[in-house]
UniProtKB/Swiss-Prot annotation:
ZnF start-end (SWIM-type): 499-535
Species name: Arabidopsis thaliana (Mouse-ear cress)
GO terms classed as biological process: regulation of DNA-templated transcription
Listed PANTHER family: PROTEIN FAR1-RELATED SEQUENCE 10-RELATED, PROTEIN FAR1-RELATED SEQUENCE 2
Signals that turn on the gene: Up-regulated in hypocotyls by far-red light treatment.
Segments forming domain FAR1: 52-138
Keywords assigned: Coiled coil, Metal-binding, Nucleus, Zinc, Zinc-finger
Domain MULE span(s) in chain numbering: 219-315
Protein name: Protein FAR1-RELATED SEQUENCE 2
PROSITE patterns found in the cross-reference section: ZF_SWIM (PS50966)
Organism domain of life: Eukaryota
Gene giving rise to this polypeptide: FRS2
Chain segments carrying region Disordered: 788-807
A GO molecular function held by the record: zinc ion binding
Role noted for this protein: Putative transcription activator involved in regulating light control of development.
């Protein structure tokens, strides 16, 4: 057979399909005007439409359904055949050792639907079996669809975040927003509603994230890992990397619906929240929908696909056509990791897809079309700061994975999220104190090492310093030279393979095939050796990134040079932004904190005395931050006390000042995190939080079975909203009503298993290229190399000049 059976879940891919049935007034059964027409030969526009039609037929008759099997075309990779069966198909497998065998509803029922895709892309009912071999039981339908024995009246439609969050969860989230606005005037949040005035998506950004974005917006990762893999809480953060090489949140979202409108709303809202300044590089998963929206919202931003996202899809998209035993992964790794020029990559790619007969595979064609977004050769001139690489588990982006549990409730998620924020704050304060109070120890007499020790933070310098000892284990040989460009072969005895470095003598531009600078932002040992051989005594300015410097978080933006601001709202926002910077610096020690508070009190008195009319107003001129917009109907919104009348008890907190205190605080937070995490449901497939935050465990998530859950129907306290528009940017105190929160939803927790690269990618976030000896065809490589600056022009540099730190 040319095709391979692959189990699929169409329930998660049919959000845009019209349902042909409506619930009856009694709420007991759904009435379908068209189910009587179900017959062989019927056409449907898509497999989702056919599935929904048959599902409503099953609801009206009273039996459960399940997707039994499906097949993809070997040529195109598209689905061509789907079988849907009665939930009582098959028989139970009895074990000989069973003492008290349980009863099983399986009866070997043959009822079902077999559909196939036609040449015109439509789907036809190939075979419909109507008769069942068991008594019809209406509850079977609800058991099969929802995983629990729910009555028919409970099966109302849920949409958006209501599928993931309970009413109490939304209340908790909104209370948090209100509390944060009291504490941080710069806090920003927005709520997205659907056409039925139900919450669809939520976004928020705190004041510290705004400050961090000003310094670390050169590269941002939009992480949809938890959404794509079916986590119960659909958390989608915007991630950056600090000058201490620490994970920082630059915005957070809960995505209730994966659609073009959702991503468009989210990206535009995020851009508004950060002041309209687009990032230098945006990293996302390899996804056509995301790619289209990034181009639309950020037309001038360099868009990059996560390498692990591409690799993780190979088994899914190419499994029917290639196997790990036929050498495909080795060929793929060599093609991606060791190609130097455009021509070299294109020829290797052509040979590879020809060998494995993938010339007409649509996904492979899409990969080649988007090659500049994921192939390392085209990354010359940009830095991904450790946010991408062959494996997610070894990247900075995986740091929050320790705080996530695929089946954690919102309450558990929220507690861990708050612990994470506090932990990161303490770690940053500790790191700031360390680099201010001590100088790093040098390991060699290398001038580069001494130079960067005075510029970089301790964490960034250690990453560069780790390359220094490896220089002595490398042997350099010049292969050829043409004009201003020379090609060197580096024999790395430590890693037991060869690397190539191209050096432009005029620009002092050293491009290495290990791609450490592109992926991590630090010169590799191979480039250091080549620069030394060229008598370069100082690190070239283009390889010293301001984002790693000790002043990396003190970036002054264009608005900092005090221009006259006539609008009171703008003045308020500007002051809040500056106070956040003051808070970051003053919180490092008790003495600095007391000094800042004293000066603030004096400044307030001085401002009041300057103009007696500048009293703090009790009414008008409502101060709203973050560039938010209000609602026309303010009657919909009320004070936060209407959301919850529970008393909030303020707990005493310890004050931590010195480095030792910060370290102790970090340890306490780790222990508290483990305690909170232990209360979450425990499954074999869960990614369990680890104590050590800085060294991610190179573990992966095991493939899991479908996990079902449901919520109770309840509408109390949340009437429908008729006057709220689809998007709400939050600054008014609260939302009194959030729409109809009801119904039940099915979530399947699917974990992608990343295929083994068989050594082609070493599992390093530094990305050393191919680890297979002999994988570099030296003769072929040197023959293909074209001299001159055009040789490495895979893409234009996305780094603005102010992101570099000159000597």
């Amino acid at each position: 057979m040319d095709d391979e059976d692959v189990e699929i879940d169409l329930l998660t891919k049919s959000s845009n399909v019209d349902v042909f049935c409506e619930a009856s007034t009694s709420g007991n059964v759904a009435q379908c005007a068209t189910v009587s027409e179900l017959r062989n030969g019927m056409d449907f526009e898509s497999k989702e439409a056919a599935y929904y039609f048959y599902r409503e037929y099953a609801r009206s008759v009273g039996f459960g359904i399940t997707i039994k099997a499906s097949r993809r075309s070997k040529r195109s990779g598209k689905f061509i055949d789907v079988k849907i069966a009665c939930s009582r198909f098959g028989t139970k497998r009895e074990k000989a050792t069973a003492i008290n065998p349980r009863s099983c509803p399986k009866t070997g029922c043959k009822a079902g639907l077999h559909m196939k895709r036609k040449e015109d892309e439509k789907w036809v009912i190939y075979n419909f079996v109507k008769e069942h071999n068991h008594e019809i039981c209406p509850d079977d339908f609800y058991v099969s669809v929802r995983g629990k024995n729910k009555p028919a009246g409970a099966l109302a439609i849920k949409k958006g975040l209501q599928l993931a969050l309970e009413e109490e969860d939304l209340k908790l989230l909104l209370e948090h927003f209100m509390e944060m606005q009291d504490k941080q005037p710069g806090f920003f949040y927005a709520v997205d509603f659907d056409s039925d005035k139900r919450v669809r998506n939520v976004f928020w950004l705190d004041a510290k994230a705004k400050h961090d974005y000003c310094s670390f917006s050169d590269v941002v990762l939009f992480d949809t890992f938890y959404v794509r893999n079916g986590y119960r809480i659909p958390f989608a953060p915007f991630i950056g990397v600090s000058h201490h090489r620490q994970y920082v949140l630059l915005g957070c979202a809960l995505i209730g619906e994966v659609s073009e409108s959702t991503y468009s709303w989210l990206f535009r809202t995020w851009l508004k929240a950060v002041g309209g300044q687009a990032p230098g590089v945006m990293i996302t998963d390899q996804d056509k929908l995301l790619s289209d929206i990034v181009v639309e919202v950020f037309p001038d931003v360099r868009h990059i696909f996560c390498l692990w996202s591409v690799l993780s899809k190979i088994s899914e998209m190419l499994n029917p056509f290639v196997s790990q035993d036929d050498g495909f992964m080795e060929s793929f790794g060599n093609c991606v990791a060791s190609s130097w020029t455009d021509e070299h990559f294109e020829r290797r790619w052509s040979n590879m897809i020809g060998k494995f007969e993938l010339n007409e595979n649509e996904w492979v064609q899409l990969l080649f079309r988007d090659r500049k977004k994921w192939v390392p050769h085209y990354f010359h001139g940009i830095c991904l700061a450790g946010l991408s690489g062959p494996e997610r588990s070894g990247s900075i982006a995986s740091h929050f994975d320790k705080y996530m549990n695929s089946e954690a409730t919102f309450k558990d998620f929220f507690e861990l999220y708050m612990k994470f924020l506090q932990y990161r704050c303490d770690v940053e304060a500790k790191d700031d104190l360390e680099y201010q109070s001590k100088q790093p120890t040098l390991r060699s007499s290398l001038a580069f090492e001494k130079q960067l020790s005075l510029i970089y933070t301790d964490a960034a310098f250690k990453k560069f310093q780790a390359e220094v000892p490896g220089v002595v284990s490398c042997q350099l040989q010049k292969e050829r030279e043409d004009g201003t460009t020379a090609i060197f072969r580096i024999e790395d005895f430590e890693e037991r393979q060869n690397f190539f470095v191209a050096l432009n003598n005029e620009l002092l531009d050293a491009c290495c095939s290990c791609h450490l600078f592109e992926y991590q932002g630090f010169l590799c040992k191979h480039a250091i050796l080549v620069l030394q051989s060229a008598d370069v005594s100082r690190v070239p300015s283009q390889y010293i990134l301001k984002r790693w410097s000790k002043k990396g978080n003190n970036k002054e933006d264009k608005n900092d040079k005090c221009a006259t601001i006539d609008n009171r709202m703008a003045r308020f926002d500007d002051l809040c932004r500056r106070f956040v910077k003051l808070g970051v610096v003053a919180s490092l020690s008790d003495e600095a904190c007391k000094t800042a508070l004293k000066l603030l009190e004096e400044t307030v008195k001085h401002c009041v005395s300057m103009d007696n009319s500048s009293k703090f107003p009790s009414e008008p001129d409502k101060l709203m931050t973050g560039g938010s917009i209000g609602l026309e109907n303010e009657g919909v919104l009320d004070c936060a006390s209407k959301v919850s009348k529970k008393k909030k008890i303020q707990k005493k907190r310890k004050v931590y000042c010195g480095p030792e205190d910060a370290t102790n605080r970090s340890e306490e937070l780790r222990q508290e995190t483990e305690q909170v995490s232990s209360r979450a449901p425990t499954f074999e497939n869960c990614y369990i939080p680890q104590a050590n935050m800085e060294e991610p465990e190179l573990g992966s998530r095991a493939t899991t079975l479908g996990v079902y859950y449901s919520t109770q129907q309840t509408n109390q306290g949340f009437p429908s909203i008729s006057s709220i528009q689809n998007g709400y940017y939050g600054h008014p105190p609260t939302i009194q009503a959030m729409g109809n929160l009801h119904s039940i939803h099915e979530r399947m927790s699917q974990y992608e298993t990343q295929p083994s690269m068989q050594g082609a990618f070493q599992g390093q976030t530094g990305f050393r290229g191919s680890a297979i000896r002999g994988c570099y065809d030296i003769e072929e490589t040197l023959h293909d190399m074209t001299m001159g600056s055009s040789q490495f022009q895979g893409s234009d540099s996305s780094h603005p000049s102010d992101h570099r730190l000159s000597n």
